[in-house]
């Protein structure tokens, strides 16, 4: 570097230290992007800019990356550690050519790789984005615009403290040299690819141009689909067309978002304060997958689970901090109250009525609005379960929005549409007490400003929050596989509902929910809740609880549930101390040590957190339950019984294992339980290990309530084979409530009608009911007998007593 440049950089650093505050994305690039700091690194930037270079230097040093202004040695000669892909702006024009010094460096590096087979330099594309304000519809500025000196100065004043340093995945120059050669053409090709990459990166960060709201409404009113339904409604109602058109405009006003980047930017500061006040930390995983989809031009539809009203804010906040555009969010019309409604609307919410069946005008306008969002490239978010889960379990998917998404594809979208399942988890859900009251019969309180203020008064530290992005689902690939001729149904005007639509949408919905549960985040509270609720008196000594947590951690670490699930990195002792600090347990001391327990109210609330992760332990718990009940059981019998029960667990808990791989997975869990000395194996027979009897009983109890529900329903079917779905649900619910009261089962979902509904559907799908819904006794009877054997004696006696009374 010349002396002049050194002096110039020194002069720039002071004003930049005041004017610039940048956020690196990702926040931990060495780990997230697998950067090897032991291998040579060269940075590629889009434009020649000293300001960008110094901004990168500051971030690189903070992140533990090499200083871009430090030279790199190649064959004993020092060279710059950076290249620019274009000369960039001058005062009155822009030179888009690759700078000669960058071209020369590319050639030197590629030749070095050709001459040295062991060389493997890392090229890291890096761009500095000054602000993320989207453009306005009708403008044609490039997504990534070079700035001359005066423009850069103005930008620094406006957006210097709203800048991001975007660090992209490493490009291996060894790979480039081996596969593409080392001539001048490759250097130019690298520069061209980098320019496209940088432009897409900027689009992914700021999003498409925002429409003028009134122009959008006028455009929708002129669409053939809405115009047609307006004319038909006017004719059917025998009213003036203008009256219906005015009604249509009112519906658009009710639905449409009024997205404001200023609110997002300024609201981010408030949300940052809020999260710091509420949570000790936010844990975000797999965001790089989503960034990649955005940069590749996918239409992204976020489909998170729904635990709390906080989900709306949390996911938008996380996406903004991960360098992505906050999505347009489908929110229930119940949230459109003052002052929250207007704020949510400017934050990206568009509002949807709970039901609009039979309202053709509303349904057509909503469908056209959604199709417009997709066509313009705005990411969209809707909650897969429809409403918040009151039990902590993942609910069955509501398929209305998903069906409209597929219908939007049948309008002829020219970009791939991808669902991104999102698992959102908390160590404390603010509404959990309200949920428990609602499940016990209290009427749901309508959302209002007073409710918000009461919630704000309760703000305190709620432990950790978790946002895990699951495995994406390409709708194009899914349709190609399950409805190969789907493109024949494309119609740009009329909404289509071909024969394949319902089964395909149901299949996508099930896959979507399974991927959400795959991305589960186990945490200190969910694990402690699982252990304590399994204990007979909801109490364990501190030592026993620690050992049980360690048992769970070993299971989750040694047999990972999925590639997207996360497990705490701390040991059992640290997790327990963290959970105790959340102040949810009763802690008593005696001469033998500490006892940790749950009072009755907390026992009910803790079922919510256990239910977040119950699917993780479904199989190991079932294996333990079989061994506990049988005392001695062959592995073949274990495999056979699990094969019989598994379809019901899979449907209820969205487990991802195929039946074809089930035996292998069960074998892995058996091996792990034997390794932990929870059970013993001799000549392919499993039996209890007396030295670890408590641990295996606690593990077995996790699945017990689920098996009790199955036994209840099967007992009813066996006694009354012609019992219909509604009667089975009602009678099973009554018996479950009786069991709950008599045996202290505090889980509100134990007698949830919806869970029995899923069970009925699975019985039918698995052939336990014939086409008329009548029980096939030859199948139901042995299954009922097997389930009965897995019940504790007192539960079995209660079921028999209730059935005798009914007879």
Curated annotation (Swiss-Prot):
Lipid biosynthesis in keyword set: yes
Subcellular localization, as worded in the UniProt entry: Cell inner membrane
GO molecular function: glycerol-3-phosphate O-acyltransferase activity
Organism: Aliivibrio salmonicida (strain LFI1238)
SUPFAM superfamilies: Glycerol-3-phosphate (1)-acyltransferase
Swiss-Prot/TrEMBL catalytic activity: sn-glycerol 3-phosphate + an acyl-CoA = a 1-acyl-sn-glycero-3-phosphate + CoA
BP-aspect Gene Ontology terms: CDP-diacylglycerol biosynthetic process; fatty acid metabolic process
Gene: plsB
Protein name: Glycerol-3-phosphate acyltransferase
A Pfam entry, by short name: GPAT_C
Family, as annotated: Belongs to the GPAT/DAPAT family.
Keyword Cell membrane (UniProt): yes
Membrane topology: Peripheral membrane protein
